[in-house]
């Protein structure tokens, strides 16, 4: 993802995330050097993933696919690309947090062999508070 992609990716973020990152948080993630990838169809961004790398751990910070393109392989492509890129960058593990109420996402990550490691109580605040399930994948 480059700076010119941020607006399109942020529009997807607002569309699909029940508690979206603020615009400042979204843009500052790019500015601080987090890694990011986009999925495009005919030059239109239909999905994105943002992750950080600390030593040998890759942290999936945010992923989103436009509603019209969900369940059509874009999320899988983004996740597989994140895993591959993380390996290239030297990571041995990918971890993430997911809302405990988000059964579709939990199923999706489990399908790609992520394991449930722990629960963080009251991790998500705002209008839809929720616990987070911590998941990880050895790569």
Model-identified regions with their sequence ranges:
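Glycine-rich acetyl-CoA-binding "A-motif" of GNAT/NAT acetyltransferases
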Residues: 44-47, 104, 129
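Conserved hydrophobic beta-strand within the GNAT/NAT acetyltransferase core sheet
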Residues: 60, 94-98
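Conserved acetyl-CoA-binding loop-helix of GNAT-fold acetyltransferases
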Residues: 71-86, 107-111
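Short glycine/proline-centered loop/turn elements that form peptide/ligand docking sites
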Residues: 79, 102-105, 122-127
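Conserved catalytic-core motifs of GNAT/GCN5-like acyltransferases
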Residues: 97, 110, 115-131
């Amino acid at each position: 993802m480059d700076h010119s992609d941020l607006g399109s990716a942020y529009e997807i973020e607002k569309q699909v995330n029940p508690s979206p990152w603020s615009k400042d948080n979204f843009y500052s993630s790019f500015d601080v050097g987090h890694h990011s990838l986009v999925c495009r169809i005919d030059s239109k961004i239909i999905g994105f993933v943002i992750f950080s790398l600390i030593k040998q751990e890759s942290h999936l910070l945010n992923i989103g696919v436009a509603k019209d393109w969900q369940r059509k392989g874009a999320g899988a492509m983004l996740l597989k690309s994140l895993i591959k890129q993380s390996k290239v960058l030297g990571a041995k593990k990918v971890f993430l947090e997911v809302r405990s109420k988000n059964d579709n996402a939990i199923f999706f990550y489990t399908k790609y062999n992520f394991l449930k490691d722990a629960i963080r109580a009251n991790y998500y605040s705002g209008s839809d508070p929720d616990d987070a399930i911590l998941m990880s994948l050895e790569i």
